[in-house]
């Protein structure tokens, strides 16, 4: 049984008030709240096991190393990677994509080679490739979408050429909630001999992800969007790909030997993890994944699907409501505008009612240009949200609308 009240008790922040109103937190697409189990894991490790990992023979260092590497194994199991060598710890999805963009472009691309992305990408899956375009002369090609927010797969197929070296797209749009057909799109790319990077920041918290079933070559996600801490993320890569890519940064831990004449690099995954890792953060990430696993990813997905369907129904009843993104397969994100009310005004006034939503372009300006708007209000749901909170949101939107 999915006991929502018991779940909410694990998140003390949900009991607080904002401007004298109960907090209604609907900004989970930006970051999720943290259960007490995750916060306690952080404090417990600082209080009792704090020591640098991989670098000491003393007991604390060995214990911290065991926790850190056990966390890597937890991530491996959670996304069903073949080996923990395929799990690279990063600061988040953004760094994961930048790591791959740099290493892949350096070793696998030359001027005129192409990367395919989609029109609905977050800036973190556009700008890193533009930096490589400026540095190496690679070409960015863009998958278009229809007005429902669904990628046009026929057009996607036409983008491939003999110069296409990589496809990189969001599993789930952070603006539209569209769940892209990743497995099908990966198969298409592989038919052309092209590897694929999936931005999984918005999918991992909301659905079961199996990187082997997807056959993804690379997959990136962030801890803080799946009830873990900020500052820690993951880049999964097939071992055969990670083996052939050069390091992204240099420093301690990623080396095997160093002289002034030559440096040789460490084995996987450590050659991509220069410097002291966020070993406290990785332990907390593992605790967050354990928390999600205990609730059941499928149970969470069912709960959030019901919430999203209910929210779509309630919001469509509001006069002047425009919802952006009505794909047949949609995750728990709803972006909207009401009448001529500016998204910043709507978000600010909802905040005064205790309702936390996101406003603006959501780091997806090319998508906003495609839709002919400058920004939206975005409500995004998590495992602890309720239908009663959706009712408060709908009532709040109606109240704000009457002010204009």
Located regions from the model:
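Pyridoxal 5′-phosphate
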Residues: 1-404
């Amino acid at each position: 049984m999915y006991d929502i009240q018991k779940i909410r008790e694990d998140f003390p922040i949900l009991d607080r008030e904002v401007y004298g109103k109960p907090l209604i937190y609907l900004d989970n697409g930006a970051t999720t709240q943290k259960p007490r189990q995750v916060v306690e894991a952080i404090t417990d490790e600082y209080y009792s096991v704090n020591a640098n990992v991989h670098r000491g023979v003393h007991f604390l260092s060995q214990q911290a190393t065991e926790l850190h590497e056990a966390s890597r194994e937890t991530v491996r199991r959670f996304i069903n990677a073949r080996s923990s060598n395929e799990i690279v710890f990063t600061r988040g999805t953004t760094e994961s994509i930048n790591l791959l963009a740099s290493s892949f472009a350096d070793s696998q691309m030359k001027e005129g080679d192409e990367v395919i992305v989609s029109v609905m990408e977050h800036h973190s899956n556009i700008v890193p490739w533009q930096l490589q375009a400026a540095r190496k002369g690679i070409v960015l090609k863009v998958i278009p979408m229809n007005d429902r927010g669904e990628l046009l797969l026929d057009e996607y197929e036409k983008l491939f050429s003999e110069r296409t070296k990589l496809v990189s797209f969001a599993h789930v749009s952070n603006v539209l909630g569209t769940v892209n057909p990743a497995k099908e799109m990966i198969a298409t790319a592989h038919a052309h001999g092209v590897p694929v990077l999936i931005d999984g920041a918005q999918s991992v918290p909301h659905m079961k992800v199996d990187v082997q079933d997807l056959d993804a070559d690379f997959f990136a996600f962030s801890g803080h969007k799946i009830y873990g801490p900020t500052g820690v993320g993951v880049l999964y890569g097939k071992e055969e790909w990670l083996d052939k890519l050069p390091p992204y940064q240099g420093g301690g831990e990623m080396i095997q030997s160093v002289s002034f004449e030559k440096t040789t690099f460490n084995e996987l995954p450590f050659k991509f993890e220069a410097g002291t890792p966020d070993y406290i953060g990785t332990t907390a990430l593992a605790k967050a994944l354990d928390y999600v696993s205990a609730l059941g990813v499928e149970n969470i997905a069912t709960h959030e699907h019901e919430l999203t369907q209910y929210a779509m129904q309630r919001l469509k009843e509001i006069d002047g409501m425009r919802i952006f993104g009505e794909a047949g397969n949609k995750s728990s994100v709803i972006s909207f505008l009401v009448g001529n009310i500016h998204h910043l005004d709507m978000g600010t006034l909802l905040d005064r009612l205790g309702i936390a939503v996101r406003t603006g372009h959501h780091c997806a300006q090319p998508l906003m240009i495609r839709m002919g708007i400058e920004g939206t209000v975005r409500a995004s749901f998590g495992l602890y949200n309720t239908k009663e909170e959706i009712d408060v949101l709908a009532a709040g939107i109606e109240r704000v609308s009457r002010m204009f």
